[in-house]
Design a protein with these regions (language model features):
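ATP-binding N-terminal substructure of ATP-dependent carboxylate-amine bond-forming enzymes
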Residues: 1-116, 120-122, 126, 144-158, ...
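Active-site nucleotide/adenylate-binding loops and adjacent lid/helix of ATP-dependent enzymes
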Residues: 2-10, 14, 22, 79, ...
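ATP-dependent carboxylate activation and anion-phosphoryl transfer catalytic cores
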Residues: 2-4, 9, 260-346
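Hydrophobic beta-strand scaffold residues
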Residues: 38, 109-110, 138, 167, ...
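Short, flexible, mixed-charge acidic loops at enzyme active sites
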Residues: 54-58, 101, 241-249, 305
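A glycine- and small-aliphatic-rich helix-loop capping segment at beta-alpha/alpha-beta transitions
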Residues: 101-110, 185-190, 321-322
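Phosphate-binding site of ATP-dependent enzymes
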Residues: 184-271, 292, 297-299
């Protein structure tokens, strides 16, 4: 067997830098070394510098205790003899088509969706109209740009207020709930918009949906799409929603995998997951997040083309419940990337 060299790419310039590093730690520890030779390429957050990182101790630490890319040997991807890239980059400058485009130009296969699907999935203001046009329900809302906010603050506030409270204000292109605020009344709205605009020049303002937070994964295996079991996220304690702290810092989240929903509801979620995946033209993998309301309505929240990928992240846990180990999922994704390069016209 010819061992394939896999570049695990992590870090990056987004606000999800640390989460990317945690995902890379997980993959590095679990990748099947009888099939693959891993190397780690870290992208420093402050300046976007690329480094080849030590396999034994690749990361430094931030003040919050989470890992980060600090230093390493300067690297040129073209000289490494890489067979496939595993871009474990979450958020802008990685999950949004930028790294995918670079790999396309260099003719290197990579795990996950292509340039267009990655870019559209990252920008909720583009993804949601596509979901709606394909028969998926989305929350009522509006898009607000930085220019609109600066030029006519009063009109923007009026439009948002007309939606009714509570609202969620979030960056159009961000993840891990960074920059997201639940707004209960009008006097909280301006600060929430300013916070979201500090993460992205475009903001999504949506009516808060009351419902259970439901998630489902997709894996592409030999060109065929498969859905995982359906899971539910339950946020405990004082958190208003599934925010960054609840996800990664204070352990106030529990998961029901599989979710305690009816078989017919599970089938509905799995069908909607495939529909969302295909609507955007995704490839390889995704995690699709929904709200299931008390009357049985299913509302799509977002699709993640490179979901959190630690052993304890939702995506691997959904597949573990279906009998696929973390190591097996990693192998499937790498092999699918190589398969697509041979059989899919770009």
């Amino acid at each position: 067997m010819i061992i394939k060299r896999v570049a695990i790419m992590c870090g990056g310039r987004s606000s999800e830098h640390e989460i990317s590093c945690i995902s890379a730690q997980g993959v590095l520890g679990a990748i099947d070394r009888s099939k693959f030779e891993p190397i780690v390429i870290g992208i420093r957050e402050s300046d976007g510098a690329w480094f080849s990182l030590d396999l034994q101790s690749p990361f430094g630490k931030k003040s919050n205790g989470l890992p980060c890319v600090e230093n390493g040997a300067p690297v040129d991807l073209r000289t490494l003899g890489v067979d496939v890239v595993f871009p474990l980059l979450h958020g802008p400058y990685g999950e949004d088509g930028t790294i995918q485009g670079l790999c396309e130009m260099m003719n290197i296969p990579y795990v996950g969706s292509g340039v267009l699907a990655s870019a559209v999935a990252m920008d909720k203001s583009f993804a949601k109209p596509i979901f709606a046009s394909n028969g998926l329900s989305v929350a009522r809302g509006m898009v607000l740009t930085q220019q609109e906010w600066k030029s006519n603050h009063k009109e923007a506030m009026s439009r948002a207020t007309e939606l009714g409270f509570p609202l969620f204000v979030k960056p159009a292109r961000s993840g891990s709930s960074r920059g997201t605020t639940k707004v209960k009344q009008a006097d909280e709205l301006s600060a929430a918009i300013e916070d979201a605009l500090s993460h992205d020049p475009k903001v999504l303002i949506e009516v808060a949906v009351v419902g259970r937070e439901i998630e489902c994964g997709v894996l592409e295996i030999n060109g065929s799409l498969h859905t995982s079991v359906v899971g539910e996220v339950r946020v405990l304690g004082n958190h208003e929603f599934y925010d960054f702290e609840a996800k990664y810092l204070d352990g106030s989240t529990e998961f029901d995998i599989p979710a305690k929903i009816s078989e017919s509801e599970s089938v509905l979620v799995q069908a909607a997951t495939i529909k969302a995946f295909q609507a955007l033209g995704c490839e390889g993998l995704a995690r699709v997040d929904f709200f299931l309301t008390h009357d049985g309505s299913l509302i799509i929240n977002e699709i993640n083309t490179m979901p959190g990928f630690t052993p304890k992240s939702v995506f691997p846990m959904l597949w573990k419940a279906q009998g696929k180990s973390y190591t097996e999922i990693i192998s499937i994704l790498i092999e699918s990337a190589l398969h697509r390069r041979q059989h899919v016209v770009r």
